[in-house]
Design a protein with these regions (language model features):
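Alpha/beta-hydrolase
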Residues: 32, 58-60, 124, 185, ...
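Conserved HGGG/HGGXW glycine-rich cap/lid loop of the alpha/beta-hydrolase fold
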Residues: 15-65
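Catalytic active-site module of serine/aspartate enzymes centered on a nucleophile-bearing elbow/loop
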Residues: 219, 225-255
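N-terminal cap/lid segment of alpha/beta-hydrolase-fold proteins
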Residues: 1-16
């Protein structure tokens, strides 16, 4: 296979997922995008990592060329979707999961539910559970109601995700492991609607992401100083570097 091996894969209930799969060796690096993003968001990083090991990126149900769903989904549903896809493609185990934004929640829950299949995890400006509630500490009063509605109403996000239920699933299955874990947080504030306290929100998110270190006894935290939320676009070399470092560490541990 080559780097341009893009195809639609059908999983249970005839759902279709648009994928980009490069099969070479194990471990396989699995890229999990944030809400509303297709697999193309990983292009710069995936193409480089495909030179050294197997990689898979995919577009979830409800986005782009993948199937559409009208039913609210939870993080657990998306973990099952990924598991079915990995099985259908017979992707080589074990896996390093690389999750961006909401994709970080999918990676975390997948690692909790399938610990024997996962050998490492990299969180790229990953969404902390219940982050919207933390925002309320610094939001002006006129933005609190809209922020809470976005948290509680699945129809307001791009994939019809039940965030409240998803966050509860993360909390219920959270436990400390010794899984190699790298956390990369953005260093620049993102622009929001008028009155949005971008710098204060950045500080909250960096602090919450630093707490991810407690998820593993083998964790590291890094800030991408020149990146906004899309670190894999702004500074792809950082994500590439951390994946390659983890691959080397895993190889060393196995030998």
């Amino acid at each position: 296979m080559n780097k341009q091996n893009k195809k639609i894969i059908y999983i249970g209930d005839n759902r279709s997922l648009y994928t980009k799969y490069q099969c070479t060796s194990a471990p396989s690096v699995i890229f999990i995008a944030g809400l509303g993003d297709s697999f193309e968001i990983w292009k710069k990083v995936q193409d480089r990592i495909s030179d050294v090991t197997s990689t898979l990126s995919y577009t979830r149900v409800g986005i782009g060329s993948s199937s559409v769903t009208a039913v609210p989904q939870t993080c657990h549903d998306l973990v099952e979707e990924l598991s079915e896809l990995l099985q259908e493609l017979d992707v080589k185990k074990p896996y390093i999961l690389v999750g961006h934004s909401f994709g970080g929640l999918i990676a975390r829950l997948s690692a909790s539910l399938n610990p024997l299949d996962i050998c490492g995890m990299i969180l790229v400006d990953a969404a902390p559970e219940f982050k919207e509630l933390a925002y309320e500490q610094v939001l002006p009063e006129n933005l609190v109601a809209g922020n809470r509605e976005y948290l509680e109403n699945p129809s307001l996000n791009s994939e019809n995700i039940d965030k409240m239920q998803s966050y509860k699933q993360i909390v219920d299955h959270s436990r400390q492991t010794d899984l190699p874990l790298t956390i990369i947080a953005r260093g620049l504030p993102d622009s929001g609607e008028e009155g949005w306290p971008s710098q204060k929100i950045l500080e909250i998110e960096q602090n919450l992401q630093a707490e991810f270190k407690k998820l593993s006894t083998s964790s590291k935290f890094r800030i991408a100083s020149h990146s906004g939320h899309y670190i894999h676009h702004d500074e792809p070399e950082i994500v590439i570097e951390e994946i390659i470092l983890m691959l080397k560490e895993i190889e060393k541990a196995l030998n």
